[in-house]
């Protein structure tokens, strides 16, 4: 059941009115119409100004429309059936122009399937591998954005939020039904180059939809993200307090950390680097008692159209709980086969190497790009071998249509089961 949301905004409607009465008593009858007119004219002008503002806001209203068609095939050892999912999504809405420095955005999603040989998480087809794209028709975003304060953006309502690289907070845009947040967000840049981003969240609208028992998470969560440029990159500090009432508070936690990401010219190319560290512990309604660490070290080197990179990412383990990132865009990390959506208690160490090649234009296709990533997984505690994964992708644009081909092959060892996935996706947006 969705929470009822009430939103309010303040406008600025002011006018200077001057009224000077200096007349002898015997002229009152003559002056009275002048007095009435002096009051009426500013009121009429103010009304005309307000009407003009509304007309401008409506004239500046922009439509929102995008569509996606995707086939996903999954072979997973241990299940009697292979999954074949052909799903589509329509997303439509509008964003008004500003009136009293405030804009309204309304957006709906409709997700359905054309081939339904898969476990959508709510259709009961448990003999198939999971493809987490259940049928749904939902209000995706409903927000008011106000910019009346200097260097400040205030967003109220159901909104999309992605912080940094979405490792801790993201919209899970890969899935057909994205993750959104009901709350209030304030972004401020009045303190020089320091950017302050604070959000209060009352409800998390997850990718599983209204019909799922885990489709909505309620609670009081707070996200604080501070960033500042330095000569060697952007330095970010963050504190995320997630308090989720659902599931016995298992996903409630507090995470505090820092991140540095930058690029430097080296020779004929560019060296990119990212380092991050965070510590996490139980918080709020959590019934657990744990503490776990996270760290990331990644380097890339780009020369013209070629980028090579490698890194190590560790989500630490604890006797009670591994380091969790329940609000992240999880598909982006630890392999596209999605075998580590929940971190085991022994944690996950991911050592990876990647290569990308920007091919450019090929025939009718533009922006052709190729990507390959190899992962080696192991436990942070105990050193168990979690297996390996090879991910391949190709993407391009044909006019206004984006085309994506992806393949993931996970080879299990002491964790999970062998799994391979294939996707072909078409995107269109106005």
Which residues does each PLM region occupy?
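Cleavable N-terminal export/targeting peptides
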Residues: 1-55
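Outer-membrane beta-barrel biogenesis signature
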Residues: 43-63, 102, 344-347, 356, ...
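Transmembrane beta-strand segments of Gram-negative outer membrane beta-barrel proteins
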Residues: 53-75, 100-106, 194
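Conserved, mostly hydrophobic/aromatic
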Residues: 65, 156, 355
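Short, solvent-exposed loop/turn elements at domain surfaces
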Residues: 71-76, 318, 336, 351
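Surface-exposed loop and membrane-interface regions of Gram-negative outer-membrane beta-barrel proteins
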Residues: 72-88, 98-143, 148-149, 154, ...
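Signature for the C-terminal beta-barrel architecture of outer-membrane proteins
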Residues: 150-152, 172-320, 351-353, 358, ...
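Flexible internal linker/loop segments at domain or repeat junctions
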Residues: 322-346
């Amino acid at each position: 059941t969705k929470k009822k949301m009430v939103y309010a905004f303040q406008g600025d409607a002011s006018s200077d009115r001057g009224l000077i009465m200096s007349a002898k008593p015997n002229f009152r009858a003559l002056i009275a119409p002048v007095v009435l007119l002096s009051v009426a004219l500013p009121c009429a002008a103010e009304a005309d100004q307000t009407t003009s503002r509304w007309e401008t806001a409506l004239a500046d209203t922009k439509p929102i429309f995008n569509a996606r068609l995707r086939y996903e095939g999954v072979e997973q050892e241990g299940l009697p059936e292979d999954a074949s999912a052909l799903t589509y999504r329509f997303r439509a809405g509008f964003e008004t122009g500003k009136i009293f420095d405030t804009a309204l955005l309304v957006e709906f999603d409709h997700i359905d399937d054309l081939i339904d040989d898969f476990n959508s998480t709510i259709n009961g087809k448990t003999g198939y591998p999971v493809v987490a794209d259940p049928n749904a028709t939902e209000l995706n975003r409903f927000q008011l954005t106000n910019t009346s304060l200097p260097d400040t953006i205030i967003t109220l309502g159901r909104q999309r939020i992605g912080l940094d690289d979405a490792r801790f907070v993201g919209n899970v845009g890969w899935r057909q039904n994205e993750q959104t947040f009901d709350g209030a967000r304030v972004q401020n840049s009045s303190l020089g180059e320091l950017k302050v981003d604070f959000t209060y969240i009352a409800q998390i609208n997850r990718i599983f939809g209204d019909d799922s028992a885990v489709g909505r998470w309620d609670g009081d969560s707070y996200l604080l993200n501070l960033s500042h440029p330095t000569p060697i990159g952007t330095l970010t500090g963050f504190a995320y307090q997630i308090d989720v009432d659902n599931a016995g508070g298992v996903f409630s936690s507090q995470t505090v950390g820092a991140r540095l990401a930058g690029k430097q010219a080296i020779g004929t190319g560019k060296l990119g680097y990212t380092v991050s560290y965070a510590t996490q512990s139980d918080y709020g309604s959590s019934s657990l008692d744990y503490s776990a660490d996270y760290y990331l070290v990644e380097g890339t080197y780009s020369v013209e159209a070629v980028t090579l990179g490698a890194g190590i990412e560790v989500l630490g383990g604890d006797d009670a709980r591994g380091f969790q990132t329940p609000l992240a865009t999880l598909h982006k990390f630890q392999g596209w086969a999605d075998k580590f959506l929940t971190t085991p208690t022994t944690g996950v160490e991911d050592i990876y190497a990647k290569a990308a090649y920007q091919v450019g234009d090929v025939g009718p296709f533009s922006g052709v790009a190729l990507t390959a990533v190899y992962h080696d997984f192991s436990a942070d505690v105990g050193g168990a071998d979690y297996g390996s994964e090879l991910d391949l992708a190709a993407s391009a644009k044909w006019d206004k249509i984006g085309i994506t081909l992806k393949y993931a092959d996970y080879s299990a060892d002491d964790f999970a089961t062998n799994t391979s996935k294939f996707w072909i996706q078409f995107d269109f947006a106005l």
